[in-house]
A protein has these predicted regions:
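Residue-level detector of high-confidence beta-strand sites
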Residues: 64, 123-125
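A short, internal acetyl-CoA/4′-phosphopantetheine-binding micro-motif in the GNAT/acyltransferase core
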Residues: 68-85, 104-105
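Conserved acetyl-CoA-binding loop-helix of GNAT-fold acetyltransferases
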Residues: 82-96, 109-117
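Conserved beta-strand-loop-alpha-helix junction that forms the acyl-donor binding cleft
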Residues: 102-117, 121, 128-129
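Conserved beta-hairpin
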Residues: 51-63
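Conserved N-terminal entry element of GNAT/NAT acetyltransferase domains
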Residues: 1-12
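Conserved GNAT-fold acetyl-CoA-binding loop/helix
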Residues: 25-43
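A conserved beta-strand-loop-helix scaffold within acyl/acetyltransferase catalytic domains
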Residues: 34-37, 63-70
Length: 134
C-alpha cells in the first residue's frame, strides 16, 4: 500500500528540493529555468523554507510544494510522474490555504491538468503563461 503525506520542510530536505527543482525532466516546467547551487538553495530556504512542505511516499521524499507570494511552486520526482502525487500535494495545500495562485508555462500540460483537477480556473492568459486561481 502506498502512503502519501506532507511534512514540514526542514534543512535535511533542502538538497532534495534543489535536486527536484533542477532535474532536467522538471526544469522545463519552472518559470525560472536556472541551475541552483547548494549554497543558493540554502540561502533561499533560509528565507522561504517555512513556506514549503515535502511529500513523502512510504517515508521517502518524492516531491515538494510551497507558496511564495501567493504563487504555488511544486515538483515531483520524475520516477513518480503520473501517479497523482502532484494532485495530492496541491489538494492538501489548498485545504490549508485557499488564497493561492498558479502561474504555469503554456506548454506545461501536466501542471495545467493538475491545477484544473484541483479546482483551479484559468483567469488570465498571455503569450508565455497561464494564470490560475480558485
Amino acid at each position: 500500500m502506498v502512503n502519501l503525506e506532507l511534512v514540514l520542510n526542514a534543512p535535511e530536505y533542502y538538497e532534495v528540493i534543489r535536486e527536484l527543482r533542477t532535474d532536467p525532466k522538471n526544469l522545463h516546467g519552472f518559470v525560472e529555468q536556472v541551475s541552483i547551487t547548494p549554497e543558493q538553495q540554502k540561502n533561499y530556504m533560509d528565507k522561504f523554507g517555512n513556506d514549503y512542505q515535502i511529500c513523502l511516499r512510504n517515508g521517502e521524499p518524492v516531491g515538494f510544494v510551497g507558496v511564495v507570494d501567493k504563487d504555488i511552486r511544486f515538483a515531483v520526482n520524475p520516477n513518480y510522474h503520473g501517479q497523482g502525487i502532484g494532485k495530492f500535494m496541491i489538494s492538501k495545500l489548498v485545504e490549508q490555504n485557499r488564497d493561492v495562485l498558479a502561474k504555469v508555462m503554456v506548454d506545461n500540460v501536466a501542471s495545467k491538468k493538475v491545477f484544473e483537477s484541483c479546482g483551479f480556473k484559468l483567469y488570465k492568459l498571455d503569450e508565455n503563461f497561464l494564470y490560475f486561481s480558485l
